[in-house]
């Protein structure tokens, strides 16, 4: 049961969490984002620069607590300078528990990265095929947790009660690589947020002062928060007020459809494809293959242009690299999964109000820092499972682009924000079930896109061991040390099935990750066509 009294902690300053950040889609997910560097980095340099960053941005050491009096019902309890100093001392103490540490260092320099994560190890050693697509499994769960997030929270219930930072870091050094991970609750924000933190870490690593965050506590979407339905005046007028329109491709379920959807999900999770049969896989597309897919898509659309009676001026047939990559992924997912061809497939992607503001937005609404999120679910127009497999790549990419174009209309973005705030606030969810398919009996999947965050540009050369351990004022600067792979994992009370991430560019190619059964990963009509790394 949620408390009616705001939590107060001595030595901490309370700052409300933004309303959109406090929706269930964010409170339910704890994420880890790892950059894999093909070098032996100095763990001490990474540690000292992380502490320097936290001192500049103390919100990274904040606790998260319930504060019913605030619009979101949640607040960051940010340590004062004196408290932060005490927390850092505790964190540095080797006798402290992992959950008490802002950053954990793990020296595995006696091991090769190949023992831990074979497909990414091939990127570390520049051994991935440059002309063909590769696929491989994630590390064993227990090994991964020890390697990247041993000090991270594992559930929302734990996070809002424990004396623990909601953002933590871990650096693990192997003989041939170093992993650097940021673990966080999704209330912190989105991929742009984590890129911003890595950039701040890079700045501190370079020995430069990290600028203080501006506008901490400014809520970018507070003006879209619907009136409090507990307000007596609002209740009195409620019947005369029109219900807000739902955004495109979202549907409100009544009791019958709600029961049907829940029963189908239980059958899927417990009987048809139990969670224990799913594994996480990573897929690498070399740049040569990306270029090939783009050429194929352009050829498909040129054929459509020449065969269509519709004038090219009436329909824009251009597609982006993201459109094509997403189309390729969806073709393979549907070809690899046992779905009845005639079954409707409902696909959701992520759009971001940071770059596509809602109607009514003015620039001054947004804080001057990046530690907040703007991610929103955007369903594509429905297709059958067969269409996802058989449509030419270019036409499927066009379908994706046209669906997203509708979704990013400012008025539709406004509706998406309002829907999230009206129905899925952690403080008080509406209890209504909204779903991105009109029919409960549908195949569904989703994909988030981190490519635009450009994690591959992070440069940790200042921590390169030879350079760091033998710094001379006249020494030439070390060559750039950029990640060759991006990996991720998450903790959620919901199923991880059918969730994918376009992780972005690294090692002159594109990385994806998602959940598959072993049979799906080896299906010769889909992912089984590619090089399997084990």
From Swiss-Prot:
Entry annotation: catalytic residues: 186, 459
Residue spans crossing the bilayer: none
Chief localization: membrane
Free-text disruption phenotype from the record: Leads to the secretion of large amounts of deacetylated MEL D.
Keywords of this entry: Acyltransferase, Cell membrane, Membrane, Transferase
Pathway annotation from the record: Secondary metabolite biosynthesis
PANTHER family, A to Z: ACETYLTRANSFERASE MATC1 (PTHR31642:SF294), TRICHOTHECENE 3-O-ACETYLTRANSFERASE (PTHR31642)
Source organism: Mycosarcoma maydis (Corn smut fungus)
Name of this protein: Acetyltransferase MATC1
GO CC entries: plasma membrane
Localization annotation: Cell membrane
Family: Belongs to the plant acyltransferase family.
Usage in biotechnology: MELs not only have high potential as eco-friendly biosurfactants due to their excellent surface activity, but also have attracted considerable recent interest because of thei runique properties, including self-assembly, anti-tumor and cell differentiation induction activities, and moisturizing and hair-repairing properties.
Function (record text): Acetyltransferase; part of the gene cluster that mediates the biosynthesis of mannosylerythritol lipids (MELs), surface-active substances that enhance the availability of water-insoluble substrates. Mannosylerythritol lipid production is responsible for hemolytic activity of Ustilago maydis.
InterPro entries in the record: CAT-like_dom_sf (IPR023213), Plant_Fungal_Acyltransferase (IPR050317)
